[in-house]
Curated annotation (Swiss-Prot):
Family: Belongs to the universal ribosomal protein uS9 family.
Protein name, per record: Small ribosomal subunit protein uS9m
Keywords from the named record: Mitochondrion, Ribonucleoprotein, Ribosomal protein, Transit peptide
Taxonomic lineage of the native organism: Eukaryota, Fungi, Dikarya, Ascomycota, Saccharomycotina
PROSITE patterns: RIBOSOMAL_S9
Region described as Disordered: spans on this chain: 269-288
Species in which this protein is naturally found: Candida glabrata (strain ATCC 2001 / BCRC 20586 / JCM 3761 / NBRC 0622 / NRRL Y-65 / CBS 138)
Encoding gene per record: MRPS9
Any one GO MF annotation of this record: structural constituent of ribosome
GO CC list: mitochondrial small ribosomal subunit
Amino acid sequence: MWMRVNRMLGNVSVRQFSNVRLVAQEYSMRVQQARNRIVPKSLTFYSANPLHEEKISRLESLLKKYALPSSQKLPGADISAEENLKQNPRPSWISFSDYALIGGGTRLKPRHYEHFIQLLNKLNNIDPQLVNTEIKNELSKYIKKSSIQSQKTQQKELDEFGRSVAIGKRKAATAKVYLVRGEGKILVNGRQLNDYFLKMKDRESIAYPLQVVDSLGKYNVFATCRGGGPTGQAEAIMHAIAKALLVFNPLLKPRLRKAGVITRDYRHVERKKPGKKKARKMPTWVKR
């Protein structure tokens, strides 16, 4: 009888020991899985729009860090809202479509954008005494870049001989023009204008930019052109002369733009299609 009792107690202890081993193995496995688990870098990874929420949390943290409560004011900061707006004008923020490129794309909703703009305005209205480089750098990311700042076109200057150089294009023709103050000579590929262009229309188109700014007979034009036909070359020279005039006087740009000689004409002859006589003309239909 005592032998049976001892056997039963031994079996129970073995089972308990095996259960403890299983629990320990399971615990170690979970610890290893927790170590190997991929943790997202952003805290907003599991939100509906992580990119937008990350920017919102960044702006809110800056407001909490630097903005004073409404009950507190710095000494010497008793100014009205109008004066504050004059001292710290509100910039033009990026549009909804531009913000969607960096703020979640199709996940971005108009209410998200409104909340984003409200936070930017609050951060921009912080007392100037509290504004630092951290706030300025954050706000500069979302200010709309003007056309002048985005293009950053370098202003051309005259060369050592007092000439302005410009390149114009039209259809398959390309022209390079050297413009210098003089008595009104025009040479094209080393030949006189009347000798190179036989059509009156082509000669008039070359002189048109000078006529627009009342400068006929005040500049010498030396042009080299290649490619295309006579009309294409003439309009390419016209385009180059207009660009060269801006080097002498950039204030002429509105007049030349209104005349339509600053912007390049990108129109080309439409190609012929298979089964058609020309670009769009169909063969004559015959019943038989």
